[in-house]
Regions:
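Surface-exposed binding/hinge segments that line
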Residues: 5, 26-76, 100
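A short beta-strand/turn structural motif
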Residues: 52-93, 97, 120-123, 127-128
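Tryptophan-centric aromatic hotspots in well-structured domains and transmembrane helices
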Residues: 14, 48, 55-56, 84, ...
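Extracytoplasmic/periplasmic ligand-capture domains
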Residues: 1-25, 35-37, 95-221
């Protein structure tokens, strides 16, 4: 909205999302955050209760945006669900502003006139269509050309190849703010162990006791 984005907004976001009875959907992102301190108007110091292998999701991840203190200061805790206007029209610093929002259907954005880079954004408006599945999203871009971009192209390779052959679009890969990882079960998953399966009491899986197996898994990944 043209007002400064400051460290106080970052601190407030943490306080807002961890307030009791607030119902913040991303509260889990802030687990382990001990304190948030403003060192100057544009710098914050975040202290954790213990070392974090990936400490960024709490404040710069795609799932936990910073909210404006001035807009939400009266919406903390149990008051949060009642702040309909703020909840459906949060003020941010991005290149676009929400013009229309239909839950589980469509979101329409228009260029933010207050954006920090006057030369951007490159588009006057953007429409995001929800619902459907990966094949229908891929088809709308690659096969019919109905949309310009689709996320989640997890479609069988042979099906994807047929769509690409239509010549309406192409596949591009890029880095995002989220992390994909493979979790290895380090405990015995044998169903015969009952409630102890896949717990510390179960001990390691028999196969993983062999160093050669562990090395093979490492090479495969």
């Amino acid at each position: 909205d043209g007002t400064p984005f400051t460290a106080e907004d970052v601190i407030f976001t943490w306080q807002y999302c961890t307030a009791p009875d607030g119902g913040c959907a991303q509260k889990a992102q802030y687990e382990g955050v001990k304190s948030v301190e403003a060192l100057d108007p544009t710098t914050v110091k975040v202290t954790f209760t213990e070392p974090k292998y990936y400490p960024y999701s709490a404040f710069v991840g795609a799932q936990s945006p910073i909210i404006q203190k001035a807009q939400f200061k009266d919406c903390v805790g149990a008051k949060a669900p009642g702040c309909t206007s703020a909840n459906f029209g949060p003020i941010g610093t991005g290149p676009f502003v929400v013009k229309e929002f239909k839950p589980n259907d469509v979101v329409t954005y228009v260029a933010n006139p207050n954006y920090r880079d006057a030369a951007k954004p490159a588009f006057a408006s953007v429409t995001l269509k929800g619902g459907g599945d990966a094949p229908s999203a891929a088809r709308a871009v690659l096969e019919t050309g109905e949309f310009d971009y689709a996320w989640n192209m997890q479609v069988e390779p042979e099906v994807l190849a047929t769509m690409i052959a239509k010549g309406k679009g192409k596949i591009e890969t890029a880095f995002g703010t989220q992390v994909e990882r493979i979790n290895l079960n380090c405990f015995n998953p044998d169903p015969a162990l009952g409630d102890k399966r896949s717990t510390t009491e179960a001990g390691p899986p028999p196969a993983l006791k062999d160093p050669a197996v562990r090395k093979a898994l490492s090479i495969a990944i």
